[in-house]
Amino acid sequence: MKNTYSYHLYTAPYSQCHVEFVTENNANERDKLVLIRFYSYNTLEIEIVQATDGYWYPVVRAYVAYSRTTGKQVNRFTTELYGESKYYQFKECEIDNCRSDMVLSDDVIQRFYNYYRRGGKRFY
C-alpha cells in the first residue's frame, strides 16, 4: 500500500509549493521511501526516483523557468536537497529526462526525508 506525505518547504513555508514523499508498506518493512515529488503551485516540477543501482536520480517533469516565482521555489528546493542551488542545471534539462550528473545517495535522501518527517509543516 502506498502512502503520501506532503510538506511545505522549510525555507519557504508560506509559498505555493510543496514536497511530497511517497512510501510503500511491505509485509517485512514499514514505510520504505520510493519517490519524492516537488510541486510548484499545482504543477509537478521535479521527481526524485530510485534506480535499480540504488542511487536516486532527478527527473524534470516541467520547465522549471516557467516564471520567476517557480524559479525561486526550485532554487530553494534544490538548496535544501543538495546543499547548493541546482536551478541552472535543472533549467538546462529536457522534460522527462534525468540528470545522471546530479545523482544522490540513499543516505542523503533518507536524511532529507527524516528531516521533514520529524519537523516539517504538513501541507493539506
What are these regions (language model features)?
Residues 1-124:
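Terminal leader/tail segments of proteins
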